[in-house]
Amino acid sequence: MKLENIDKSIQKQDILKGISLEVSPQKLTAFIGPNGAGKSTLLSIMSRLTKKNQGILSIKGREIESWNSQELAQELTILKQKINYQAKLTVEELVSFGRFPYSRGRLKPEDWEKIRETLDYLELTNLKDRYIDSLSGGQLQRVFIAMVLAQDTDFILLDEPLNNLDIKQSVSMMQILKRLVSELGKTIIIVLHDINMASQYADEIVAFKDGQVFCKGTTNQIMQADLLSQLYEIPITLADINGKKICIYS
């Protein structure tokens, strides 16, 4: 996935300015930065939920506007930060929604097979008949990831999926995402507010500030005290623990 000079403004206010970057395939890339930096807006543009004002966004060498909706939904999926659900659905029913780009609502045997594989992969089979409104926050988020995985796309975009999860649930979620990359070859782009989670689990980091790319590189390149202090405008020092850099806030 490649972005070239992406601009976005809303009511004459610049939200994104000249965003250019290339997402490495089969890696977990974290978007970090202060609130209002444009991370979630860019994720929406990358999934074509929000229109860009100008610039070029291409997936596998094709401009995103040239993909029809069904084609795009078989290549890329996004899980937004806020998901509204009102229907009384079981875990299995919600996961089955991921097959819509293929089944158009008429599930075939191969769709059910993919659903079963996904439930098993994420250890949700024992919960498949539970109603989603009876699940804990961590269980529910795992079910949403299962729905995304059932869609079977190469690109997975996640907007702050750790929100409302405790530390144990957050670690479990990040471990799952790392497995999707290492075992299934997925390309994952995730918006994170916890820099230390990015340090522990991301392969690459793109930092945003004031609607622009502030810096980008491997996790080791970005986890530098001076860069992060400038990014967040607070004093940050780093500690090296078991080969991983951890932020300490002054």
Each language-model region and where it sits:
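Conserved ABC ATPase "signature" region
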Residues: S96, P109-L127, D152, L157
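Conserved structural motif at the start of ABC-family nucleotide-binding domains
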Residues: M1-L3, L16
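The feature captures the beta-strand-to-loop junction immediately N-terminal to the Walker
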Residues: I32-P34
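Helix-to-loop junction immediately C-terminal to a conserved catalytic motif
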Residues: S47
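Conserved ABC ATPase signature
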Residues: Y131-L135, Q139
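ABC ATPase nucleotide-binding domains
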Residues: L231-S250
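Conserved ABC transporter NBD signature motif
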Residues: G55-E63, L72
